Amino acid sequence: MKAQRRFGLALSWARLTTVFVIDLLILIVASHCPDSWQGENRIAWWVGVGIAVLVTLLSVVTYRGITVTSGITAWLWDWSADPGTALGAGCTPAVDHQRRFGRDTVGVREHHGRLVTVITVDDGEGDAAGRHRHRTTQSAVVPVATVAENLRQFDVQLDGVDIVTVEVRGGAEAARASASLDEWGPEEWGMVGESPAANRRRTWLILRMNPQRNVAAIASRDSLASTLVTATERLAQVLDGQSCAARPLAADELAEVDSAILAELEPTWSRPGWRHLKHFNGYATSFWVTPADINAETLDEVWLSDAPEVGATVLTLRLVMRAGEPRLSAWVRYHSDERLPKELSVGLNRLTGRQLAAVRASLPVPSTRAQLVVSSRELLDHDELELPVGQTQEHATSATTGQ
């Protein structure tokens, strides 16, 4: 992995035009100041020139992918906002919906006219014994290209699909999360030897839809919810059995997803910082991945599975459609008891001033605008990027002598 250069330039036409107009207004005001303000050396004029130069630098120069003014504004907004309210906004109770000829009951969450549904994916080991799958791969994976192909399904256009994976480190918590009581009873969680229990990964696909972009699709179906549920069921059926086990979640399961993605982060006890998010039992630090580095090797490295400082990792891959082509971006969040050592984040780009936004962007929450915008790359036709799901290593077999 390689982090992008710390400083850069944002030179879009819209930004340059806005900055030019602001500078022009500043110079006009400075040139029309009273003579008593100008003095012999035209002090007011040169002060105006200095302010214009400062505004230009702050608006054009970027730090870690964001302009200085945007970074400071975002940080001040997060710092002044109540984290509990900010993270809870949009986490409305979901409603179960089943299509007239549908098979599954799908939970739909609505907020400000936008809709969200969630698909859970895993390796299928916990399914009933009578359910057979003809998997085309040896290990359970989510093929990113397959998900991207389903951003548009006939007349339904999704705003985007987020692939969110949470990995809890080995130990008692991961043993509980692995949910195999026959293999690991409660009395055995604390009796593991030197080898740790398996790191537990849980993965969800979060589908987002803007009804205003799907007027024709909605007109031919029962309702808004039915339109998104149709796309959700179709994507789940495409993934299920081919490379992983997939099923849409019901309404009562969405609240559990909120809690799992927060990874024990308590919103009401959190304080946003410039470089991390401080909460009552540790730190949450978010980074974005350089687009050119979003590949299988990088996705294997970002977990930091061997780092004892990290208790949980949350990885988000975002797929959106831009100009008819799918684009991919990624960011990762680490939970630790202390501040994350710098050597663990080498090659990643810190989300400076946007730590709270990074947490909220990973939640299954409908939003009228993107909570987080990071650099992305085009997903090519031959891109074979896959995200493994399920456990990352076998349970420890060593135990105490008495056991």
Swiss-Prot record:
Part of the ESX-5 specialized secretion system, which is responsible for the secretion of EsxN and a number of PE_PGRS and PPE proteins. It is a multi-pass membrane protein. Belongs to the EccE family. The chain crosses the membrane at residues 9-29, 43-63. This is ESX-5 secretion system protein EccE5. Part of the ESX-5 / type VII secretion system (T7SS), which is composed of cytosolic and membrane components. The ESX-5 membrane complex is composed of EccB5, EccC5, EccD5 and EccE5. It is found in: Cell inner membrane. It comes from the Bacteria. Signal peptide: none annotated. Its main location: membrane. Keywords: Cell inner membrane, Cell membrane, Membrane, Transmembrane, Transmembrane helix, Transport. One of its GO terms (cellular component) is plasma membrane. The gene is eccE5. InterPro entries: EccE_dom, T7SS_EccE.
